[in-house]
Amino acid sequence: MIGKTITNFSPLTEGILLKRYKRFLADVELDTGEVVTAHCANTGPMKGVLHVGGRVRLRHSPSPSRKLSWSWEQAQVPSGQSFSWVGVNTALPNKLVRLAIEAGCLKQELGEIFEIKNEVTYGVARKSRIDLLLTPHFNNSDSRKIFVEIKNTTWAKGSTAVFPDTVTTRGQKHLQEMINEVPSSRAVLVPCISRNDIEVFVPGDSADAKYGDLFRLALNAGVEVIPCAFDFHLDCITWEGTKPFLKGENF
């Protein structure tokens, strides 16, 4: 299924990133010469992805209910002797992973799925939300519910994808909650690798040492890790398969 189209959309508009500011805003000079302000859904540091003067792709969605009609969707980054397009819209990973499951791309890893629910409340205090809750088909040998936590992964060191790119107390909490779900349920961490130049995934110990420690603790407790890669094009996003992972940057 490598190369399978997961979602299609109207062709994006290309331009040059002039600046990103106030976390949510980015000024872009379109190839027509027009300068526009786009919404940036990614409020993090965007390590290794934010390149002033680099090429970007925007979605144009004019609407009276929107303050900004442009949204920053993709960024072009150096990759070896070439370039790679990276998805920077943090609202997409959950949708992409769900679509990949529905398309059967993860049948080998997850089995046949009967039902998928989004944003389900769970956890010891019932104050957390799992990205996806899967109910296996009755034919599956493993009938346990599957809790799926998805992490948008854009930072890369060479051909290695790394998450997180900064300290994430929220991510730490999610790992702790997932540990509590096994073995009565399956808990699966899915790094959603939003670029096509990756060979392996590692937790970002250099950015968040505690997250790295919890990642390894979760592995030992039975939490599964399934890194999923996608390729971002001008008018579609395709499935690039699952990737192997290492236990840490120094392992």
Curated annotation (Swiss-Prot):
Pfam families: SfsA, SfsA_N. CDD domains: SfsA-like_bacterial. GO terms for molecular function: DNA binding. HAMAP family: SfsA. Belongs to the SfsA family. This is Sugar fermentation stimulation protein homolog. It comes from Prochlorococcus marinus (strain SARG / CCMP1375 / SS120).
